[in-house]
């Protein structure tokens, strides 16, 4: 990871308006809706890019590049919500200086990748409400009024492991709740149990 540690801790892009933090991109058309409703992958991909390359891109910048290159547009695009698919490695290397690799859905694999300076574009879902998302203030209060979080899946960036916990940048809400959320090994194991979607280890092109 090229970004200095202090800057890395502060880096955060919410997909929603979030008291103005996401004002520049939350309403931009993306996927079948907009960034606020469908942009967790985009925001997490932008975090991965900036952490690994020390660039200063925002989700708006990345989406603009997609459009310039003909890579946006829901069903018509091979990008879709899968920003880190290995099918896009050539494009991502050229456009953003990163590559992705499939990684096992396990705490051990995540810790190994982070220890080698990579970051993880990670997905899960909470269809049964059995392994809720955590927030930086220590709460597990669902943001969904129905009490079930992310029933359709969600994507975050796991960027560090320190003092026995993973640090997660979750684009769902404002920075005070969702930046650098700590997940213990046990919490991460339960989070990973949410689905069997492929996880991606993301590296800088060297």
Stretches with model-predicted labels:
Residues 101-102, 120-124, 157, 167-169:
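Structural recognition of the beta-strand scaffold that forms the well-ordered cores
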Residues 37, 133-150, 157-206:
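Noncatalytic regulatory segments and standalone regulatory/sensor domains
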Residues 73-104, 115:
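Mid-length scaffold segments of soluble, non-membrane domains
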Residues 41-49, 59, 63, 90, ...:
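Extracytoplasmic/secreted envelope proteins and their assembly/folding machinery
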Residues 1-81, 149:
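Active-site-adjacent structural segments surrounding the nucleophilic cysteine of cysteine proteases
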Residues 3, 89-95, 190-194:
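Short, conserved catalytic or adaptor-binding loops enriched in Gly and charged residues
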């Amino acid at each position: 990871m090229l970004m200095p540690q202090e800057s890395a801790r502060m880096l955060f892009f919410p997909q929603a308006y979030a008291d103005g933090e996401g004002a520049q991109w939350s309403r931009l058309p993306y996927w079948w809706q907009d960034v606020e409703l469908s942009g967790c992958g985009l925001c997490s991909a932008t975090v991965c890019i900036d952490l690994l390359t020390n660039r200063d891109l925002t989700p708006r910048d990345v989406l603009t590049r997609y459009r310039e290159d003909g890579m946006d547009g829901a069903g018509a695009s091979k990008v879709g919500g899968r920003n880190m698919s290995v099918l896009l490695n050539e494009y991502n290397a050229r456009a953003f200086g990163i590559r992705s690799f499939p990684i096992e859905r396990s705490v051990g694999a995540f810790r190994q990748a982070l220890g080698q300076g990579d970051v993880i574009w990670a997905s899960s879902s909470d269809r049964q409400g059995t392994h809720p998302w955590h927030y930086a203030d220590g709460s597990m209060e669902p943001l969904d009024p129905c009490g079930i979080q992310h029933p359709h899946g969600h994507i975050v960036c796991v960027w560090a492991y320190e003092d026995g916990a993973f640090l997660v940048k979750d684009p769902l809400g404002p920075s005070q709740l969702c930046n650098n959320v700590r997940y213990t090994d046990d919490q991460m194991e339960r989070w990973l149990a949410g689905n069997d979607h492929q996880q991606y280890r993301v590296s800088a092109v060297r």
